A protein has these predicted regions:
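Sec-dependent N-terminal signal peptides
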Residues: 4-18
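Beta-sheet-dominated interaction scaffolds and their linkers
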Residues: 20-54, 93, 170-182
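Short, solvent-exposed loop/turn segments enriched in Ser/Thr/Gly
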Residues: 26, 37-43, 102-104, 115-123, ...
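Extracellular Ig-like/FN3 beta-sandwich strand-entry sites
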Residues: 39, 53, 101, 117-119, ...
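Short edge beta-strand/loop segments characteristic of extracellular beta-sandwich folds
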Residues: 43-47, 186-194, 236
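Intrinsically disordered, low-complexity Pro/Gly/Ser/Thr-rich segments with frequent PxxP/GP/PP motifs
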Residues: 77-113, 210-241
């Protein structure tokens, strides 16, 4: 069984190496501040670094994620803040010769609607025109088994449109707790974007002893969260000794607006 698993992994590596020669040049996130009724343009440059031509297609997808690590890339629309219907792409299919580049143009047509507010987003997904099909012959105890695998490598470019400076900015602290993983101790902070604009920030945890004296600030990872989505942050507090503490959790990245919460800590091991 171990040999079979290793053979499958090796097969996947061989079959995907070809399309892996296609790369996206430039930023993978395109942000636009827009007005209702406006038209905005952009270009995605695809490069074929291989020695064979590759056929590609560009598809519009909607994208959502949550704090549990679930990601949804699905045909639009799957949420009310999708801008996929506003976007046109040319070409949507093409063949890229070896060693050459392809310019994919897109236009964003913002609807003339007064009720547009906040952030809207979607994904332009670059993938092979047909899934790569690879076959291999696996041998085990004088038995032969032919397996066919379909493998798809995708490159995603996010298209974000903000309607001016409109829309509310608001987050919700869903859960805070101490967790242990990989021999270290963390404060896990789950945050949901309940506003109308995308946000990017990192939580900062300041811990106080029973006398109210600060014993240090501990930064978590940074993340971007779209409206209705959520993310999980971890702040390493392994160096904090056993004891009871109070923690103040605040978020940066919101200018003069600060979001925060408090929690009690009981570190026992």
């Amino acid at each position: 069984m171990k040999k079979i698993v290793l053979s499958i992994i090796f097969l996947i590596l061989l079959s995907t190496n070809s399309f892996a020669q296609i790369s996206v040049l430039g930023e993978l996130t395109r942000k636009y501040v827009v007005k209702p009724g406006g038209v905005y343009e952009g270009t995605i440059v695809l490069r074929n670094k291989g020695d064979k031509p590759h056929d590609v297609k560009i598809k519009k997808k909607d994208y959502l994620f949550d704090r549990e690590g679930k990601n949804r890339f699905e045909d639009p629309p799957i949420h009310p803040r999708s801008n996929s219907d506003w976007i046109s792409v040319s070409p949507s299919k093409a063949s890229i010769p070896p060693g050459e580049s392809l310019n994919v143009s897109f236009k964003i047509h913002i609807p003339q609607k007064e009720d547009l507010s906040g952030s809207y987003w979607s994904i332009l997904m670059v993938e092979p025109l047909e899934p790569i099909v690879a076959e291999t012959l696996l041998r085990s105890e004088n038995k032969k088994l032919t397996m066919s695998l379909k493998v798809v490598i995708q490159h995603a470019v996010q298209i974000i449109t903000d309607i001016g400076d409109t829309g509310t900015t608001k987050i919700k602290f869903v859960e805070r707790k101490i967790v242990n993983k990989e021999g270290k101790r963390f404060i896990q902070i789950d945050i949901e974007n309940v506003g109308e604009r995308w946000v990017t920030f990192k939580p900062i945890v300041e811990i106080f002893d029973q006398d109210g004296k600060s014993i240090g600030k501990f930064e978590a990872n940074r993340a971007r969260i779209f409206p209705t989505c959520s993310a999980r942050f971890f702040s390493d507090i392994s160096e904090v000794p056993k004891g009871k503490y109070k923690a103040l959790i605040v978020t940066d990245g919101f200018g003069e607006k600060v979001f925060g919460t408090r929690m009690n800590l009981n570190i026992e091991d």
